[in-house]
Amino acid sequence: LINIFFTAVKFIHIIIIRNYKGVNMAIKVLVYNEDSNDIEAYYLEESDTMPYATEGSITVGEFRGSSNSPTIWTTKGLMECWNTLREQWGSPIEVRYAFKRLWEGGHGAQSQHYAGTAMDMAQSFSPEDRDELRIIAELIGCFVYVEPAYLTPTWVHVDRRLNPPACAAGYIMVREGSINTYVLILQDALNTLGFTGAGLDGVFGVGTKDALMAYQESRGLTPDGIAGCETWTYLTSEVRGMGSTDTTVL
């Protein structure tokens, strides 16, 4: 195990390389650490445990699920909530769907799955066990949202979204200085549409602002460089499920 630390002005990248020779084949896992307001980067194999998760409780491959992306992201807070839920349940919990990138689609236009803050689980459980798991997820008070059974009767959806949303049930407003996984969604969408310069690091800097303003101006939106309700609505509707492009940062 090799740990390499890179320190920048406002954030820290932590790169963990388990197999240096195979790093190009590894999955890049970006984690937003709410405690330090940093983005951490890990290079892991699909069989490795997710960062901050209890050893062996959920692998990178399980969290990646049906996504084909070589880069995925989540938050420390979600993984800590998962640890508590798993501990309270006392036995393995199947997770079939967690992460997707916006251009891959598969969920609603402003789904928390694209932010890496949502998990769909317990698909193979009995209805009674799913009901019990929902109750536990509510009682631990860690998840921001636990979907009621009448909406997802054959699985349990939990998420740890950030609030308040710019639009009802949507994403938070992000602007220059923001650091979180919603910035990653924004950067990913802009890159995919050809508005490059933002990178894919979860840090809303000058490059992200310039790319966003160019997008807003091209779509007849107020070019204020802020991703609010109107911009999120246009951008997510346009990119969701369109597939990657030559300018997508994978």
Where in the sequence are the language-model features?
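Active-site acidic/histidine clusters and adjacent loop/turn architecture
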Residues: A26-E94
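Short, surface-exposed alpha-helical recognition segments that flank or form part
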Residues: L1, S69-W73, S178, G199
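DNA major-groove recognition helix of helix-turn-helix
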Residues: Q216
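N-terminal compositionally biased, intrinsically disordered segments and leader/signal-like regions
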Residues: N3, A8-V9, V60, G197, ...
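Catalytic cores and adjacent binding grooves of peptidoglycan-active enzymes
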Residues: K28-E34, G108-A118, Q123-G194, A198, ...
